[in-house]
Swiss-Prot record:
Annotated Gene Ontology cellular component terms: plasma membrane
Keyword presence, Cell membrane: yes
Alphabetical UniProt keywords: Cell membrane, Membrane, Transmembrane, Transmembrane helix
InterPro entries to which the protein is assigned, alphabetical: UPF0324_pro (IPR018383), UPF0324_YeiH-like (IPR004630)
Lineage summary: Bacteria, Pseudomonadati, Pseudomonadota, Betaproteobacteria, Burkholderiales
Entry keyword Isomerase: no
Protein name per the record: UPF0324 membrane protein BP2808
Main localisation: membrane
TM regions (residue ranges): 20-39, 43-62, 98-120, 135-157, 164-186, 196-215, 235-257, 267-286, 299-318, 322-344
Recorded family membership: Belongs to the UPF0324 family.
Membrane topology: Multi-pass membrane protein
Length: 348
């Protein structure tokens, strides 16, 4: 009697999930190429922003062309892969960068992040009637690092994808406006800062890293260098902010469960991973070529996550809260421009 052994195919659920992940990866690869086109780069649109826009267009107009079973892979990319990518984003930060801007740069970063989060959360809920998640996601995008911060907050809050999408929209609109506005008001003589203070102001108040570089590069290289370092200092504050958010959510959950203390602590493990990898990067123990390769791969995975979020978002959901979210984005932008000016004046 002979026995034949054949290779069994993957179980259907896993095969469908893998197909969904690969589909998003192919879309993300196209997005990266699209974001690299000169006419898109000049506006400072990162692959993350282009990814969510392309994902939303596909999800709302062409979703029927994707097998429904692949949705599990899209969801996995928008949740699990997202968290891994946020953790590896820590390789973009180092203690040396934070030290380079000194106490004034750190003080401005802390002041801007804390005040913007507070204003956004309170104004969004009490003045504009937004739900907690949408208000906090929008505030995070303005306060810390644009789309990447929205991505980091979303799994911690367990927010719906469309809430992240509208928050990212404010980052795109007002961050892009900054790239044109800041050089204009500087050359008009309305920003009486030296190079160091000007770099701190731009890095401390513009939404995304690419937008910071876009705004500062229209002034001079020295300002661009300072602005980029200060911006990365704001990014580094993502970890303590997420940890505080986790403890606050636990306290809220405990209060809502008749004071029971066993409520699950939603401290995001990827925030710890972010911190560990930032320390690893500071120690300079990994080959520079390896770090560069991981950073590029991480941007690609983040682009996949944003694309997947876009696919899961529906325009009808955005229209429901769109005007109020944009109003909150405008309030926060006014605070960044004028309040940020005051904070820089005090710190420098």
């Amino acid at each position: 009697m002979t026995t034949t052994t054949s290779t069994l195919p993957l179980p259907t659920p896993w095969r469908d999930k893998l197909n969904g992940i690969l589909f998003v990866a192919l879309m993300a690869a196209a997005v990266v190429q699209l974001a690299d086109l000169p006419f898109i780069r000049q506006f400072g649109f990162s692959p993350l922003v282009v990814g969510i826009v392309c994902g939303m267009l596909y999800g709302n107009f062409l979703r029927g062309t994707m097998p429904a079973d692949w949705g599990a892979g899209v969801h996995f990319t928008a949740r699990r892969l997202l968290r891994i990518a946020v953790a590896f984003y820590g390789l973009n930060i180092s203690i040396q960068q934070i030290a380079a801007v000194g106490l004034p740069g750190l003080a401005v970063s802390v002041g801007v992040v804390a005040s913007t989060l507070l204003i956004g959360t309170v104004a969004g809920q009490r003045l504009l009637g937004l739900d907690r998640d949408t208000a906090m996601l929008t505030a995070a995008g303005s306060a810390i690092c644009g789309a990447a911060a929205v991505l980091a907050f979303e799994p911690t809050l367990r927010a719906a994808p469309h809430k992240s999408a509208v928050a990212v929209a404010t980052v795109v609109l007002f961050g892009t406006l900054s790239m044109f506005l800041y050089p204009v008001i500087y050359h008009a003589g309305w920003l009486p800062f030296d190079t160091q203070a000007l770099g701190i102001y731009i890095g401390g108040t513009v939404h995304e890293v690419a937008q910071v570089v876009g705004a500062a590069s229209n002034i001079d290289p020295a300002t661009t260098e300072v602005a980029t370092i200060v911006k990365m200092t704001r990014v580094a504050l993502l970890v303590p902010v997420l940890l505080v958010l986790g403890f606050w959510l636990r306290a809220s959950a405990a209060a809502g469960a008749d004071g029971k203390s066993h409520a699950k602590l939603p401290v995001p493990w990827f925030a710890i991973g972010f911190l560990v990898l930032a320390i690893v990067n500071s120690l300079d123990i990994l080959p520079s070529d390896l770090v560069t390769a991981i950073r590029k791969l991480d941007v690609f995975v983040l682009t996949m996550a944003m694309t997947a979020l876009g696919i899961e978002t529906r325009f009808a959901q955005i229209r429901k809260a769109g005007p109020r979210v944009m109003a909150l984005g405008l309030v926060l932008y006014a605070w960044l421009v004028f309040g940020g000016y005051g904070i820089v004046k005090l710190a420098t």
